[in-house]
Amino acid sequence: CAEGGSSIDEWSKESTLFRHAVSEAKFAMENSELIAILWHQGESDGRSKKYKNYYHKLNILVNSFRKELGDLEVPFIVGGLGNYLGKSGFGRSCVEYDLINQELLKYVENNRNCYFVTGEKLYPNPDGIHINAESQRRFGIRYFKAYQTKSSIVEPLDNEANMVKELYEREYTMAEKRYITLEQFTLGKSSMEEVMKFLK
C-alpha cells in the first residue's frame, strides 16, 4: 500500500493507512505467502527534528505489522532516503533525510530480521522527491538483494546497471504481453482485430 507524503504518525496502528495496509496484506495472504514487508517512508519526517522520535515510532509500527499479520519473524526491509533530497522541488524541505537514514540504520542493527537498503545514487523525477523509473528499478534490485541475502545493502550494488539493462531487455511474459496489448487497445492505439489476433 502506498500513501505519498505521509508521515510516520499517519501510520500509527489505529490509523486508516495502517488498517488498510493490514487488510490488503491479509487479503493477498489468502492465496499468497507473506515473505517480507518493504518500508519506504520518511521524507515528511525529514525536517523539524522529527527524526528524534522516528526510531520509537518505527519500532511500534514494525511490531504492530508483524503481530497483525501473524508472523513475528517476517523480514522488515527499510529503504533509505535518497541523497538528492533537501535540494529542489517538493524534496527541498527534507533537509534532515540523513538523520532519518541514521535512525533507520540504528533500528535495523538493533532488531532481528530487519534490513536497510541504501537510497544512495538514486535520482528524482523533476518534482525533487519521487525517484525516477530507472532508480525505482535499482531500488527494487537492492530490496531483493537484501531479502535474498538477509543483510543490509549499505552501498549501491556494483552490477546494478547491468541488472537494470537485463530487466529492460528481457522478453515479456505472456501476461505482460496481454496487458500491453489490451492497454494499447484501450488507449486507441490498436484495433480490435489486433487484439483478437493476439488472443488466439
Predicted segments with their positions:
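Cell-envelope and extracellular/periplasmic
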Residues: 1-200
